[in-house]
């Protein structure tokens, strides 16, 4: 099988590596001349995918290369690039392993929070109202991936210094700080046919956010079932077509969901493969055309992936 992977950053490294484990041939497309995933790909094409469909000779050459593969898998979170890819693939009849509707919700922390509230998902206490705000709190820009722009604020002065123009409900999420260990898990499939994968423990620090992943999890079976139920409920509400991950914290008061992302993650899929032999890239591809993923190992083994 031949796949096009668009984006050579962390997600691209993950996908190119897993593609090799699956025995796939990869075409990596990135606008940079030497992205991190470059040496993991079989073929590389430098291209700005927002220009697909244009008249440029080099762009048309890249289009021809992409059309020679079986499926396009995005490994980036640039809204303009994703929209351009979605439109171009639709026009060309090319399979695109992406759910734009689910991504539109999960790429916004405000829209995600609305979904959590509709689903009854346990989340950190909102802290937008000054009269009920208890520090420390977490400030998150609504748009953006992971921990980018997220700050732990200890008092009102720090909040005003970090958001000097005042709190804009359209641009920020303020919520109570929740201490405790962090966990992640993925779900993949189509409505009525989802599979939930191995829970992983996230190693966190102040400097690098997630600095490593451990599998299998050290959490209790009952806590794992609680995470799985929350993720399945969210996927069904979104009518997810593809792959989504969930990050939670186990607080003294119970589980608190931090975020969901309907895109291919980095770090955790490698840990899942090392522990179980299950390849999340294969399962993602199987959502879009007939493909039989490998069965994995009989029993999980210990894996610790640090970076």
Residue ranges and their predicted role:
Residues 1-98, 293:
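ATP-binding N-terminal substructure of ATP-dependent carboxylate-amine bond-forming enzymes
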Residues 36-40, 54-57, 104-111, 149, ...:
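Short, charged, surface-exposed secondary-structure boundary motifs
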Residues 175-238, 250, 261-289, 296-298, ...:
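ATP-dependent carboxylate/phosphate-activation module, predominantly the ATP-grasp catalytic core
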Residues 240-252:
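A short glycine-rich, hydrophobically flanked beta-strand micro-motif that places a catalytic Asp/Glu
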């Amino acid at each position: 099988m031949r796949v096009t992977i668009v984006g050579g950053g962390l997600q691209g490294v993950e996908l190119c590596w897993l593609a090799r484990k699956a025995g796939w041939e990869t075409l990596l497309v990135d606008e940079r001349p030497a992205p991190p995933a470059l040496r993991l790909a079989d073929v590389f094409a430098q291209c700005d995918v927002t220009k697909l469909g244009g008249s440029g000779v080099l762009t048309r050459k890249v289009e021809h290369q992409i059309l020679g593969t079986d499926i396009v898998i995005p490994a980036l979170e640039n809204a303009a690039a994703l929209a351009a890819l979605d439109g171009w693939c639709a026009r060309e009849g090319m399979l695109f392993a992406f759910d734009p509707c689910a991504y539109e919700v999960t790429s916004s922390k405000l829209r995600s929070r609305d979904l959590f509230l509709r689903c009854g998902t346990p989340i950190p206490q909102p802290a937008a109202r000054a009269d009920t705000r208890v520090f420390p709190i977490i400030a998150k820009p609504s748009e953006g991936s992971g921990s980018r722009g997220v700050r732990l604020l200890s008092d009102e002065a720090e909040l005003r210094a970090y958001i000097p123009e005042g709190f804009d409900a359209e641009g920020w999420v303020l919520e109570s700080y929740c201490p405790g260990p962090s966990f992640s898990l993925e779900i993949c499939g189509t409505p009525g046919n989802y599979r939930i994968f191995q829970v992983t423990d996230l190693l966190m620090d102040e400097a690098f956010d997630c600095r490593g992943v451990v599998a299998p999890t050290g959490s209790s079976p009952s806590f794992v079932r609680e995470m799985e139920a929350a993720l399945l409920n969210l996927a069904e509400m979104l009518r997810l077509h593809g792959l989504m991950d969930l990050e939670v914290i186990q607080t003294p008061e119970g589980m608190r969901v931090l975020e969901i992302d309907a895109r291919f993650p980095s770090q955790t899929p490698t840990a899942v493969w090392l522990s179980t032999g299950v390849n999340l890239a294969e399962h993602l591809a199987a959502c879009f055309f007939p493909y039989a993923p490998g069965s994995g190992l009989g029993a999980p083994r210990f894996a610790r992936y640090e970076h």
